[in-house]
Amino acid sequence: MYEYFLGQVTDVTPGYVVIEVSGIGYKVLTANPYRYQVGPTAVKMYIHQAVSENGMSLFGFFDADEKALFEKLLGVSGIGPKSALAILANNDHAGLIQAINQENATYLTSFPGVGKKTAQQIVLDLKGKLNDLNVDVTGQTALDVDAPAVDGALADALAALEALGYSKADVKKVTKKLETFSQTQGADTNTLLSEGLRLLMKK
């Protein structure tokens, strides 16, 4: 089993990144691919290896605590790797832990693939068991909102636009419109990225 990879990111896509280690390129699924940038600088990516009847998949994480949170979610009945990854894509891990501790089912059921029964199971299995994880809040907390914050998704979309070759100045010109769009639509990273591309192509 892998603990982490240390290598260069050679490709970034909406669903995964490719990291090259000792001349071998690994396809790694990650919640927020645009957190990474293609370049010669070596990055450390924590890895969870999942084996199923469909083959082997690698899931990547920014640090050990994010990986630990993912693996805790996997221990909940009804949560598979892709569902756990979708939950982490919100980018507000402290808000997630707070929601679990407060039994905030409305917050939890807003994630893809999480129904009321699964939300209750998450609370039952994980309440009070995640407080030792060192995670940061990148958006609003569960106290402030009944649905996941869009701040993390917006940041990822803006980073993605720059990764696609748009200048910081061009991206800055559409940031305000994307902020408004995200607040009214509650959009995820891919939706915000598509809207950003549409706005930039109009210029």
From Swiss-Prot:
One of its GO terms (molecular function) is four-way junction helicase activity. Residues 142-148 are annotated as: Flexible linker. It comes from the Bacteria. Coiled coil: none annotated. It is found in: Cytoplasm. GO terms for biological process: DNA recombination; DNA repair. Residues 63-141 are annotated as: Domain II. Homotetramer. Forms an RuvA(8)-RuvB(12)-Holliday junction (HJ) complex. HJ DNA is sandwiched between 2 RuvA tetramers; dsDNA enters through RuvA and exits via RuvB. An RuvB hexamer assembles on each DNA strand where it exits the tetramer. Each RuvB hexamer is contacted by two RuvA subunits (via domain III) on 2 adjacent RuvB subunits; this complex drives branch migration. In the full resolvosome a probable DNA-RuvA(4)-RuvB(12)-RuvC(2) complex forms which resolves the HJ. The RuvA-RuvB-RuvC complex processes Holliday junction (HJ) DNA during genetic recombination and DNA repair, while the RuvA-RuvB complex plays an important role in the rescue of blocked DNA replication forks via replication fork reversal (RFR). RuvA specifically binds to HJ cruciform DNA, conferring on it an open structure. The RuvB hexamer acts as an ATP-dependent pump, pulling dsDNA into and through the RuvAB complex. HJ branch migration allows RuvC to scan DNA until it finds its consensus sequence, where it cleaves and resolves the cruciform DNA. This is Holliday junction branch migration complex subunit RuvA. It comes from Lactiplantibacillus plantarum (strain ATCC BAA-793 / NCIMB 8826 / WCFS1). The lineage of its organism: Bacteria, Bacillati, Bacillota, Bacilli, Lactobacillales. The gene is ruvA.
